[in-house]
Curated annotation (Swiss-Prot):
It catalyses: L-tryptophan + O2 = N-formyl-L-kynurenine. This is Tryptophan 2,3-dioxygenase. The keyword Heme applies. Pathway: Amino-acid degradation; L-tryptophan degradation via kynurenine pathway; L-kynurenine from L-tryptophan: step 1/2. Its EC number is 1.13.11.11. The keyword Nucleotide-binding does not apply. It comes from the Bacteria. Homotetramer. The gene is kynA. InterPro entries: Trp/Indoleamine_2_3_dOase-like, Trp_2-3-dOase_bac, Trp_2_3_dOase. Heme-dependent dioxygenase that catalyzes the oxidative cleavage of the L-tryptophan (L-Trp) pyrrole ring and converts L-tryptophan to N-formyl-L-kynurenine. Catalyzes the oxidative cleavage of the indole moiety. It comes from Geobacillus thermodenitrificans (strain NG80-2). Belongs to the tryptophan 2,3-dioxygenase family. Substrate binds at F49, I50, I51, I52, H53, Y111, R115, T252.
Length: 280
């Protein structure tokens, strides 16, 4: 009797014939996505390793999609639509941060069973992660040779290197609103990592001291702080997870591993948005 109660008939309006119509699996191209987890070993836990990294790359793709649109909104002096995009990016970052706790279920012994299969493949080579860092203002031309084997990605990386970051766009928004910004900042070489500037800090201080007058700039600043803070948390969780799994071994891509990742924690984003808090 219990089994019958748990059964139910499909509602009459539910479609069941997809011979000539698009289905859920067809729309999402699940045949391609779900056939892309190709293990190079017979070890059970390699599937976890692959899926964590593949899903992270999908989330990064969405971050870049939202970030590109947000930067354009700011450059167009249309700040408000960007706030929704930044809020979404922040939620995506939370997903990415949480994914490290899933990967940390992989023990050192389990990882060593298939690590050699990776060769020199490494998260260091994640071009989407590099594009996110570029978009947040941390440019580094020295990483480009890592991607020269793929002309399309190399061109995309080069273009991003020379494009304004979201912080460059935000600083231009300050100038558009009449806040004095040094000319060498407004016309700087975008391929270089942004360096702190007194005029930018003073402009942000003016915004924070006059919130009602500059509400949208204030909101923009706080959205950037959210994203910068989440990115630092992601970096920390990355470092912590790597240390938990491989200790201080060198990375498969040739980096110093945990030591390299720890150095990245010293490179924060949007410097004046942090220093102003002491002076406010």
């Amino acid at each position: 009797m219990q089994n019958k109660q748990n059964q139910f008939e499909l509602e009459k309006g539910i479609h069941t014939d997809f011979q000539e119509e698009m289905s859920y699996a067809g729309y999402l191209q699940l045949d391609k996505i779900l056939s892309s987890q190709q293990r190079l070993s017979n070890h059970h836990d390699e599937m976890l390793f692959i899926i964590i990294h593949q899903t992270s790359e999908l989330w990064m793709k969405l971050i870049l999609h939202e970030m590109e649109a947000a930067i354009q909104c700011i450059l167009d002096d249309d700040l408000e639509p960007s706030f929704k995009m930044f809020a979404r990016i922040s939620r995506i970052q939370q997903q990415l941060i949480q994914s490290w706790s899933v990967l940390s279920t992989l023990t050192p012994s389990e990882y060593m069973e298939f690590r050699e299969c990776l060769g020199h493949a490494s998260g260091f080579q994640s071009y989407q992660n590099r594009l996110i860092e570029f978009a947040l203002g941390q440019k580094n031309a020295h990483v480009l040779p890592v991607f020269q084997h793929d002309p399309e990605i190399y061109e995309k990386m080069t273009r991003a290197l020379h494009s304004p970051s979201v912080y460059d766009a935000a600083i231009k928004a300050l100038a558009v609103r009449g806040l004095p910004i040094d000319e060498d900042v407004l016309h700087r070489d975008y391929s270089q990592t942004y360096q702190p500037n007194a005029s930018v800090e003073e402009a942000w201080l003016t915004v924070y001291r006059n919130v009602d007058r500059y509400w949208d700039l204030y909101e923009l600043a706080e959205k950037l702080v959210d994203i910068g803070s989440q990115q630092q948390t992601w970096r920390y969780m990355h470092m912590n997870t790597v240390e938990r799994i491989i200790g201080y071994k060198k990375g498969t891509g040739g980096s110093s591993g945990v030591s390299y990742l720890k150095k990245s924690l010293d490179r924060s984003f949007f410097p004046e948005l942090w220093t102003l808090r002491t002076k406010l």
